[in-house]
């Protein structure tokens, strides 16, 4: 299990009141991405954030929509699921999405929670999606990371 050593930061209920967060979620492997989005939305709303879900076709479409969302949202959560196949396409997609999301966050100074799963098997994805049989909840974790980072940046700006 890869959850060993996970962060312990939590967000107090209601502490993100007034924060606008977009969830950009791909439709490939929808059984996984729907669960990721549900878990992320629940975490955001519990924290008090105003959450908007924006669907995209696949993982490669996530970065451009995330970049646009940084213009109107305080934080963005990127969710998707890329599962290893028999070609190098997996590596290209995973690298492009990860690089794109990191670059967007740094350039725009807008938090981007990365909940794009990159798994070898469907079973690994299920185990990370936050459903009833999952050992991890990457959708909620990405939301918590985005909200916490937004709160941190806001407090740094106030200093």
From Swiss-Prot:
Presence of the UniProt keyword Transcription regulation in the record: no
Pathway connected to this protein: Cofactor biosynthesis; riboflavin biosynthesis; riboflavin from 2-hydroxy-3-oxobutyl phosphate and 5-amino-6-(D-ribitylamino)uracil: step 1/2
Full protein name: 6,7-dimethyl-8-ribityllumazine synthase
Signal peptide: none
Keywords: Riboflavin biosynthesis, Transferase
InterPro entries the UniProt entry points to: LS (IPR034964), LS/RS (IPR002180), LS/RS_sf (IPR036467)
Pfam families: DMRL_synthase
């Amino acid at each position: 299990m890869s959850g060993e050593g996970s962060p312990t930061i939590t967000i107090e209920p209601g502490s993100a009141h007034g924060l606008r967060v977009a969830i950009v979620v791909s439709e490939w492997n929808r059984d996984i991405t729907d669960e990721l989005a549900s878990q992320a939305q629940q975490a955001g709303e519990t924290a008090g954030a105003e959450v908007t879900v924006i669907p995209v076709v696949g993982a490669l479409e996530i970065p451009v929509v995330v970049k646009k969302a940084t213009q109107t949202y305080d934080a963005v959560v990127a969710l998707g699921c890329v599962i290893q196949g028999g070609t190098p396409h997996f590596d290209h997609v995973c690298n492009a999405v990860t690089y794109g999301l990191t670059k967007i966050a740094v350039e725009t100074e807008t938090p981007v929670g990365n909940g794009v799963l990159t798994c070898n098997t469907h079973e690994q994805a299920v185990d990370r999606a936050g459903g009833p049989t999952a050992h991890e909840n990457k959708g909620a974790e990405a939301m918590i990371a985005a909200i916490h980072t937004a709160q941190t940046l806001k407090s740094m700006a106030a200093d």
